[in-house]
Amino acid sequence: MSNRQRFTDKVVIVTGSAQGIGRGVALQVAAEGGQVIMADRSEYVEEVLTEIQCTGGDAVTINADLETYAGAQAVVVKAIEHYGRVDVLINNVGGAIWMKPFEEFSEEEIIKEVNRSLFPTLWCCRAVLPTMIKQQSGVIVNVSSIATRGINRIPYSASKGGVNALTASLAFEHAKNGIRVNAVATGGTEAPPRKVPRNANPLSQNEKNWMQQVVDQTKDRTFMGRYGTIQEQVNAILFLASDEASYMTGSVIPVGGGDQG
């Protein structure tokens, strides 16, 4: 953890904060003096809250379904009621559910992928904008993915491509309101076993093979030949969220060890 205090007195919403990258972001924001609103639909977010409070940090949690606009609005309302403002929004919800060729996806599965990996970011941006416009200040960091190209996850890739487009367009539209919008395109990242599984279990041998192809592609086409760590992703996200990146907006920063897709 950094000894810096980049988020002192700043109110920071972190979505998807019960585990993985989101948990790492929430812990470090709190360690750097931030007031954290942790949004997740898993009860495991309460364990992260306990970790923060045990080290003297300031945080609250909200269980919310961010695949709905009502869920996103509830998170912003909680932040305003508890802290009075929102300085930073970090959109971290998402993740591929199935890994298989596009023609193997059903209509229902495609909709679920888009609901998981595009709409939470879209809804949270929409929900927080009125507050940031009123403040004439704010920072949004969207967690995207290197996987906007590659095999066996096209609905997820399309969703993250949408996140990248949203990032660029919001930055252009709201620079005049003092709002910066950037994204980190994460590559393959090593993480502890997930308490709440993100991917559907591969049932057939074909599904196992398709998933393995994605894993192999990630390592084989990465210059550095390895997965990143959660801390390496957290470092990039919080750089963009902090005043250190005050002259950056509309950027999508790849953090994937040179991943070429």
Question: Which functions belong to the PLM regions below?
Answer:
Residues 2-4, 96-99, 226, 237-238, ...:
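Short C-terminal tail/terminal secondary-structure segment
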Residues 5-37:
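Canonical Rossmann dinucleotide-binding motif of NAD(H)/NADP(H)-dependent dehydrogenases/reductases
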Residues 63-75, 107, 231-232:
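The beta1-alpha1 cofactor-binding region of Rossmann-like NAD(H)/NADP(H)-dependent oxidoreductases
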Residues 100-102, 106-114, 204, 214, ...:
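Substrate-binding pocket helix/loop in short-chain dehydrogenase/reductase
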Residues 103-122, 137, 141, 163, ...:
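Catalytic Tyr-X3-Lys loop
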Residues 125, 159:
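Active-site helix of classical SDR
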Residues 130, 172-176, 246:
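Alpha-helical segment proximal to the catalytic Tyr-Lys
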Residues 176, 188-221:
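A glycine/serine/threonine-rich, flexible loop-to-helix segment
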